[in-house]
UniProtKB/Swiss-Prot annotation:
Protein name as catalogued: Ecdysteroid-phosphate phosphatase
Taxonomic classification: Eukaryota, Metazoa, Ecdysozoa, Arthropoda, Hexapoda
SS bond list: none
Top EC class of this enzyme: hydrolase
Subcellular location: Cytoplasm, Cytosol; Nucleus
Residue spans of biased composition, Basic and acidic residues class: 466-479
Keywords: Cytoplasm, Hydrolase, Nucleus, Protein phosphatase, SH3 domain
Domain named SH3: residues: 271-336
């Protein structure tokens, strides 16, 4: 038998083995990506592998800065974990809710060890390695809580690190700067001019075994080691000092025993921007608009957000790098650090309660922790984020992310009606017959497999039914005047209601399709009104004075019925002159069975912000036109602010808008007694109640944020208790429903 001759050429096995040892950068280069793009992608994704980097490059295909030489900015934090972090997160949430946004909310709780510095993209891997090496070289880990000393002044609140512990952290910072200076500057001395520009603090510390060029010796090396502190609040109004001080005093720093070092980086464009989180998706209608996706972040100029009169601003997408205009109220402000990339986490404590449990729990793009609930964090050590790994578990990470996202939906309360036997023989008239039990510990799998007849239903403790308890099929809703609490019956109330669903927001551009050349209205959908009243300026007049959809009319009627069941008494009715508001008010009064008993008083001063109407006051229907259309308006009512006054307010500021609505509500209260129903716009719920309850006018951005949380037919109740007005829970439940897009019948025959 012939001897098998050896092969001189490289075999497939050797080729396969060699490819397995390629670095992510080499793989990206083999895929055809230019070096500078590949390095930028790896740095932007924290060196988490080829798949994530290539996805980033594809997402940024329309990023105009993709080929720019713009080094990322890096920073090193010492971050608390465990019980102390939970305290701080609760403080962050409460301080923001009670006192509004301040500078501390822009970042995760931290102690800054090395301030922002710039580094070229090819150095990101070395920066990450250096952090681990520094801790390994130091050796000693914290075995007790850091000593933190509270400090409070009129413009700053926080904890300062005691000298002994501060020295330990300073040594880490100094050693890191030294390590980076040696490894990066010396190893890339031929590119020193570029490095010097990126590292303005490097050069003072050098190694005797390395050759650092003379031109670098004048560079100052200064890590952030002066007065190490953890900021709790700053840049806050002095009026909030006492409230913040009370919150700070509840913090217990004695449990600050778990800490970790984190290396973050950010897009250099982020340095002067405000970060907004997308909360509602948006598909562009114009070429200059930016697509909004849930999970994306938008970089905006603070000045543009505050000065925009139409609610639109130009922003940059964190996800794609694209620039375009977007509706600001589809986003909400969030911490700037949410849009940073996390490169490395290294433990500083012997007892570990990490906030980042494992590589799988990190967002696969920027490294933020997916789980933000304190109970979801495991008190176990997480492995280091390995630079240059292939990150083959990305699919599992996505699956885990989806499980985390869907968890609230999968753990909805289990609702079960008692069986007919129980309804017939065991029903207690004072006990609601639906039991809602929340099983937060069970998984979606176990819930889906559990037979319905095996759900244990335990009757709740007997209690009088609430008048608005619509979940209870046997609640007593008979109208007994004596059933209301006597003290609450005497208190004066204002019911402020937003109009229902409107045609223009539901169908978009509708006028050209619903009116013929003679101006005759033609219904195009069952959710559109059958007819429209006559108006002198038709159809143009409907452009800024949209009618309700039929769903909107029904929404308003439901609210009226619920108020009737709750035995709400209405003594006066005021309404914005917008047709959609008049329709809403009429339908609500029908539900309240007050048609013909309460006339609608039209008050132009209740109209929404005039900055949204630069072309002037809308051409509303006249009182005669409304009367002809069978609307029961008060023809004799003289408004507090006539429509002519609005013409002079076309450029009113947000504060002036609040003052206008507040002035109207004060005068209405002075002129009347009893309860008042106000039907107007989304803004009205806030502008007519905020100052009345002791608040101050919101900024433009804050107003946009709050109105997006006020859906159609929302109802706010303000009650006067001992001479003080305050927001209270409405007597009726809200109305909630899903979107129902248009059905195209021929879609069934499409091939």
């Amino acid at each position: 038998m012939a001897t098998l001759p050896p092969r001189k050429s490289q075999t497939p096995t050797r080729i396969c083995i060699s490819k397995q040892h390629l670095t992510p950068l080499q793989t990206l280069l083999q895929m055809g990506f230019p070096r500078h793009r590949a390095e930028k992608a790896l740095a932007s994704t924290g060196n988490r592998g080829v798949q994530i980097a290539s996805d980033w490059l594809l997402a940024h295909v329309n990023d105009g800065t993709l080929d720019e030489c713009a080094p990322r900015e890096y920073i090193i934090y010492a971050c608390p974990t465990g019980p102390f972090l939970q305290q701080l997160e609760e403080f962050w949430a409460k301080s923001r809710q009670m006192c509004g946004w301040n500078g501390a909310h822009n970042y995760v709780p931290h102690i800054t060890l090395v301030s922002f510095f710039k580094a070229p993209d090819e150095c990101s891997l070395q920066l990450s390695k250096a952090l681990k090496q520094v801790v390994d070289m130091t050796g000693a880990l914290l075995d007790r809580p850091l000593k933190l000393e509270p400090y409070m002044s009129q413009n700053f609140m926080g904890f300062f690190v005691a000298e002994e512990d501060a020295n330990y952290l300073k040594r880490l910072a100094l050693q890191y700067v030294k390590e980076v200076s040696n490894s990066i500057i010396s190893d890339t001395y031929e590119q020193l001019d570029a490095i010097v520009a990126c590292f303005p603090w490097c050069g003072a510390v050098s190694s005797g075994t390395r050759c650092i060029p003379r031109s670098s010796r004048s560079i100052s090396l200064e890590p952030h080691v002066k007065s190490l502190h953890l900021t709790l609040a700053y840049q806050f109004p002095q009026a909030q000092f006492n409230a913040l001080k009370a919150l700070v005093e509840t913090l217990d720093a004695s449990c600050a025993s778990n800490w970790e070092l984190r290396l973050y980086s950010r897009d250099p464009r982020l340095a002067t921007k405000q970060v907004q989180k997308v909360v509602y998706p948006h598909n562009p209608h114009e070429t200059d608009e930016l697509e909004l996706r849930i999970g994306d972040y938008i970089y905006l100029n603070t000045e543009v957000v505050d000065s925009s009169s139409d609610g639109w601003a130009e922003g940059i997408s964190w996800l794609t790098g694209s620039t375009g205009h977007l509706p600001v109220n589809y986003t909400e402000r969030t911490a700037e650090s949410d849009a940073w990339t996390l490169h490395r986490v290294v433990q500083l404590s012997k007892s570990v309660a990490s906030s980042l449990t494992s590589a799988e729990d990190l967002d696969i793009v920027d490294g933020r922790s997916i789980s933000t609930e304190p109970d979801d964090r495991q008190n176990t050590a997480h492995p280091d984020i390995i630079e240059g790994s292939s990150f083959e578990e990305s699919e599992q990470s996505v699956e885990k992310y989806l499980r985390q996202t869907l968890k609230p939906c999968l753990e909805l309360p289990s609702v079960q009606l008692l069986n007919s036997h129980n309804l017939t023989h065991q029903h207690n008239p004072n006990t609601p017959t639906i039991e809602i039990t929340t099983n937060m510990s069970s998984s979606s799998t176990s819930m889906s497999k559990q037979p319905v007849d095996e759900i244990l239903v335990e009757p709740p403790a007997a209690q009088p039914p609430r008048p608005d308890d619509t979940l209870s099929v046997h609640s007593d809703h008979s109208l007994h005047p004596g059933s209301l609490d006597a003290s609450h019956a005497k208190n004066r109330k204002i019911y402020i209601m937003r109009h229902g669903e409107r045609v223009d927001f539901t169908f978009g551009t509708w006028i050209p399709y619903c009116f013929d050349e003679f101006g005759n209205y033609m219904r195009k959908d069952l959710n559109m009104p059958k007819t429209l009243p006559r108006r002198k300026n038709s159809p143009e007049g409907w452009q800024n004075d949209s009618p309700l959809t039929n769903v909107g009319v029904y929404q308003a009627n439901l609210i009226g019925q619920a108020l009737l069941e709750a035995q709400v008494q209405i003594d006066h009715v005021y309404c914005s002159p917008s047709y959609r508001c008049i329709q809403t008010c009429t339908s609500a009064l029908e539900g309240l069975k007050l048609t013909g008993k309460q006339k609608i008083k039209l008050e132009p001063g209740l109209f929404e912000w005039m900055a949204w109407y630069p072309s002037g006051v809308p051409d509303w229907l006249t009182k005669n036109e409304l009367t002809e259309a069978k609307f029961d308006v008060d023809l004799d009512y003289e408004p507090v602010q006539p429509a002519s006054e609005l013409t002079a307010r076309l450029k009113e500021s947000t504060e002036q808008f609040y003052e206008r609505n507040h002035d109207v509500i004060l005068q209405l209260l002075e002129q009347t007694t009893g309860n008042i129903l106000v039907v107007a716009h989304a803004t009205t719920l806030d502008t007519c109640s905020r100052q009345l309850t002791g608040g101050v006018p919101r900024s433009t951005n804050e107003l946009r944020q709050v109105i997006h949380k006020i859906p159609y037919c929302s109802l706010a109740t303000v009650e006067q208790v001992d001479g003080v007005w305050k927001l209270v829970e409405p007597e009726c439940l809200p109305v909630t429903h899903s979107k129902n897009p248009r059905f195209e019948w021929n879609a069934l025959s499409a091939t």
